[in-house]
Amino acid sequence: MTESFNSDTRILLGRKLSGRYVLTSLISSESGTQTWLAKDLVLSREVAVVLTNPFQVINSDHISLFRKEAKLISRLNHPSIITVLDTTGDEDLEAIVIELVKEETLFDYVERTGPLSLTLALQITKQIGDALSYAHEKGVFHGNLNPKHIFLCPDRGPQ
């Protein structure tokens, strides 16, 4: 069932959530979620929308966990952690709206430039460690940390 969710994005393209967020293009699809670029019609800005697999909406435990995680993450306030802006549940979709980060991922950077220098690797590792330590103190655990989920933001550090 996850395959159907991940393979047919045309159904979701242009979909409006909560009368506010219009899905404009798919950014990524993995682990039973999709991340979409969306237009916030109220604040006239671009955001990212993380959708849970619609086949999971019938699973109340899954939706309860998804909402609980969104609530926990929304309480985090750290320069290296992406900000949760909103949540929405429309018909067959549950979503978390987050700030859109357009910077390069660590994965893409290494693909483009090759291995990191020791100095840069240590700098990035320290900043990630600081963010994870902060999140853990607040009871939030990432669970899927990898180079594709780390954005290199020159003005804020890795996110």
PLM feature segments, named:
Residues 91-105, 109:
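Conserved short submotifs of the Hanks-type protein kinase catalytic core
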Residues 129-140:
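Protein kinase catalytic-loop region centered on the HRD/HxD motif
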Residues 53-75:
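AlphaC helix of the eukaryotic protein kinase fold
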Residues 28, 68, 76-80:
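Flexible N-lobe loop architecture of eukaryotic-like protein kinase catalytic domains
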Residues 39-46:
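Conserved N-lobe loop of protein kinases adjacent to the ATP-binding glycine-rich P-loop
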Residues 87:
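Activation-segment/catalytic-loop signature of the eukaryotic protein kinase fold
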Residues 23-31, 35:
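Protein kinase glycine-rich loop
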Residues 124-125:
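Activation segment signature within eukaryotic-like protein kinase domains
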